């Protein structure tokens, strides 16, 4: 299960060949995800996605994804960069941020 938030839809834009491979792999492995998105019409590579939208516009080139003990921070710019951190404590810390965002966005959407 992957969780994340930020500048979604950029993988297809900056790495279109890898995007096709990634999308196919996720479908074959039945990988699910909970993403907090900036735009409702962004292309998401995963098939089984639960998505909520931030209630305000956030201008960012950064995307954070967490999977198992891995945290990947993408910097989507002319030459994309990423930092991969393989550490369970770091992944759990980012997971806690995601839980807080997700809970508060659920509360906003119920009003």
Regions found by a protein language model. Give the residues of each.
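Hydrophobic protein-protein interaction segments
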Residues: 1-86, 90
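Signature of lipid phosphatidyltransferase scaffolds
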Residues: 82-111
């Amino acid at each position: 299960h992957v969780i994340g938030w930020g500048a979604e839809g950029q993988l297809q834009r900056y790495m279109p060949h890898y995007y096709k491979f990634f999308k196919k792999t996720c479908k074959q492995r039945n990988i699910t995800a909970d993403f907090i998105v900036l735009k409702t019409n962004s292309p998401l590579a995963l098939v089984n996605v639960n998505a909520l939208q931030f209630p305000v516009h956030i201008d960012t080139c950064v995307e954070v994804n967490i999977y198992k003990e891995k945290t990947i921070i993408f910097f989507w710019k002319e030459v994309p960069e990423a930092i991969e951190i393989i550490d369970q404590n770091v992944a759990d810390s980012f997971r806690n941020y995601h839980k807080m965002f997700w809970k508060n966005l659920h509360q906003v959407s119920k009003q």
